[in-house]
């Protein structure tokens, strides 16, 4: 267990947008979309569970990022296989040529490429994440490297199977929760102290073997 640090900081523009959201942002389409929303953190003073989930979905994540991800798929006998991804993520506000008049319902753009094992390497998932996914479902495409074909991927949502997870993860499991909130009833159940995977930089940067982290 690592000690907690207040290691998050936000740009002044994001803090100002958050102040404006506190006054102006409201939910539309039965809670499935946002109106008058700027940049990040739509409900800085959340009143219910749905507003808390929207704060998670639309939180500030640095504008854009690129990361390497390792996914383990464990089996009942304790064996497991590893899949390696390169992921790229960009919020619309980080794009200088973003045209809100054409894609006003887009929240961010996401690309995930499998780099290993070789049987999956080169497969790519591309997502245009929409704010109101009941009004306009998430736009997703899959490139199959073996077939050299691109197909639309409407199954990449809700409880559709997660990439290369052998059915052990759903699409909306990624990032704790993602996508439209309409299929759940969100409630605040109070607060309790828990351990969370945060401030674990020594673990992330260590040379610990995979077996020791199972």
Question: Where would I find each of the regions flagged by the language model?
Answer:
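Conserved small/polar residues in nucleotide/adenosyl-binding loops
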Residues: 204-211
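Solvent-exposed N-terminal domain segments of exported/luminal and surface proteins
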Residues: 1-137
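Acidic, serine/threonine- and glycine-rich low-complexity intrinsically disordered segments
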Residues: 125-126, 132-201
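Generic detector of intrinsically disordered, low-complexity, polar/charged segments
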Residues: 27-30, 75, 164, 187, ...
């Amino acid at each position: 267990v690592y000690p907690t640090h207040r290691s998050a900081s936000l740009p002044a523009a994001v803090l100002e947008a958050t102040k404006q959201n506190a006054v102006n942002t409201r939910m539309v389409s039965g809670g499935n979309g946002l109106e008058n929303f700027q940049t990040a953190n739509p409900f800085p003073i959340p009143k219910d569970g749905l507003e808390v989930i929207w704060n998670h979905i639309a939180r500030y994540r640095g504008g854009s990022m690129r990361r390497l991800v390792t996914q383990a798929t464990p089996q009942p006998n304790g064996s497991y296989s590893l899949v390696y991804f390169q992921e790229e993520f960009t919020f619309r506000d980080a794009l200088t040529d973003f045209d809100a008049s054409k894609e006003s319902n887009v929240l961010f753009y996401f690309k995930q490429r499998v780099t290993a094992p070789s049987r999956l390497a080169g497969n790519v998932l591309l997502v245009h994440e929409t704010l109101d996914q009941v009004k306009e479902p998430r736009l997703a495409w899959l490139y199959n490297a073996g077939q050299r074909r691109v197909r639309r991927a409407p199954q990449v949502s809700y409880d559709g199977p997660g990439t290369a997870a052998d059915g052990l993860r759903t699409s909306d499991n990624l990032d704790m929760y993602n996508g439209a909130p309409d299929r759940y009833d969100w409630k605040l159940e109070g607060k309790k102290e828990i351990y969370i995977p945060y401030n674990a930089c020594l673990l992330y940067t260590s040379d610990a073997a995979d077996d020791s982290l199972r």
